[in-house]
């Protein structure tokens, strides 16, 4: 995946917490990947600040990765397609994170009645790429909307 070739972790002190941002999923030359812009965006957007705080804990568990997904989905008015997230990807992610038949004891729910969701569940690597790509595109979207220019 070309977007995963360049991956960096940035830490920046903001207020009383540290924000760790996985930056440069596209290119270091992309002005929308500028760390200062991301930090400034977090200072004016509570949703961005919360996602950054959650990313500090990692996304290697279904509960935290789902929190990140929920915040972005809500912020985008449940229209993740404009971030390049397909309905199929969203369904695969939510089914994997939620259903114990797909993710075992680590799922968000202890029991879900009915049929097991059809289709291939996301692997942990798939989920990591899905979440970080979505975060990156969401930040780019917000910066492209000129939020910091106001």
Per-range role (PLM):
Residues 1-60, 88-92:
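Helix-loop junctions and short alpha-helical segments
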Residues 39-42, 138, 142:
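Short, flexible helical or helix-coil boundary motifs
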Residues 52-76:
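Short, hydrophobic, well-ordered secondary-structure elements
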Residues 70, 86-140:
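Histidine-centered, metal-coordinating catalytic motifs and their short helical/loop contexts
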Residues 77-82:
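Short helix-loop boundary/capping segments
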Residues 144-150:
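Long, compositionally biased intrinsically disordered regions
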């Amino acid at each position: 995946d070309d977007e995963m070739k360049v991956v960096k972790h940035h830490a920046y002190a903001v207020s009383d917490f540290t924000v760790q941002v996985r930056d440069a999923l596209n290119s270091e030359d992309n002005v929308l990947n500028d760390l200062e812009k991301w930090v400034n965006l977090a200072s004016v957007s509570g949703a961005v600040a919360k996602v950054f705080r959650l990313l500090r804990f990692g996304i290697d568990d279904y509960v935290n990765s789902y929190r990140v997904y929920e915040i972005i989905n809500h912020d985008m008015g449940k229209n993740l397609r404009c971030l390049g997230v397909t309905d199929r990807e969203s369904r695969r992610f939510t089914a994997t994170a939620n259903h114990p038949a797909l993710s075992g004891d680590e799922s968000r729910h202890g029991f879900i009645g009915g049929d097991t969701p059809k289709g291939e569940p996301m692997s942990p690597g798939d989920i990591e790429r899905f979440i970080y790509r979505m975060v990156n595109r969401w930040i780019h979207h917000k910066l492209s909307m000129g939020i910091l220019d106001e």
